[in-house]
Amino acid sequence: MIKTTLLFFATALCEIIGCFLPWLWLKRNASIWLLLPAGISLALFVWLLTLHPAASGRVYAAYGGVYVCTALMWLRVVDGVKLSLYDWTGALIALCGMLIIVAGWGRA
């Protein structure tokens, strides 16, 4: 389960970077060349999703919980926003949901 969780975090990071770089280009007038690493990051994101040993719908559902946590870490580290009690609570609930789904992969 630890390997799966780490893979989910790597997947989420690739997705966030792949979306953040075009956002920088569009909102902050950054270089259009950021679209190249953004495309590579999103392609890596898609490839990483294929490495999970479950049906795609289960993978996407479980991945959503980790994505929430990763996005909140991004909010704190990159955007410099202090997380609220609601952020922490939501992340904990999302992560619990992911763990429940992943724990049932072999039983479904």
From Swiss-Prot:
Membrane topology annotation: Multi-pass membrane protein
Domain of life: Bacteria
Main location as per UniProt: membrane
Keywords (A to Z) from UniProt: Cell inner membrane, Cell membrane, Membrane, Transmembrane, Transmembrane helix
Periplasmic side: 1-5, 52-60, 106-108
TM region(s), chain numbering: 6-26, 31-51, 61-81, 85-105
Keyword Transmembrane part of the UniProt annotation: yes
InterPro entries per the UniProt record, alphabetical: UPF0060
Transmembrane helix in keyword set: yes
Cytoplasmic topological domain: 27-30, 82-84
Record's GO cellular component terms: plasma membrane
Compartment(s) where it occurs, according to its Swiss-Prot or TrEMBL record: Cell inner membrane
Family named by the database record: Belongs to the UPF0060 family.
NCBIfam families: PRK02237.1
Name the UniProt record assigns to this protein: UPF0060 membrane protein YnfA
Organism whose genome encodes this protein: Escherichia coli O17:K52:H18 (strain UMN026 / ExPEC)
Gene name as annotated: ynfA
